């Protein structure tokens, strides 16, 4: 129960032997927020906000079922960021983290609505291309991804050249 739209209150009522009752109100706002946060972290990467490996696994299972039922096609692009370790080693993890956020934004600007980008961890990303109409479409997307990630990034005044390996 929410009294003011901001706090969550749990109400419990116990009947007493004499016919009366005891009502207990407990503010569970923080507990509910913590549970929601844990549920979110179980499915999304904290750094980039992208779906994580668990969420990806759920989605690909759904997509494979659709493929079986309808005969659709899907394509999977496994992306490994080249030279990411040297970015972390030379510029530090905070810059590396910002670079990963920029990589995820750049990937997001390329894929179509309905496709899924997930971060598997470290410098590994996966794109689930949900409806390539022809095999050439998946190859075309892979080339666009490689080309986009070859363009240098500017992170806090640092020009960062990376690349990507896609399989």
Describe the residue ranges of each PLM region:
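Per-ARNT-Sim (PAS) sensory domains and their PAS-associated C-terminal
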Residues: 1-9, 19, 158-160
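Sensory coupling linkers of modular signal transduction proteins
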Residues: 16-42
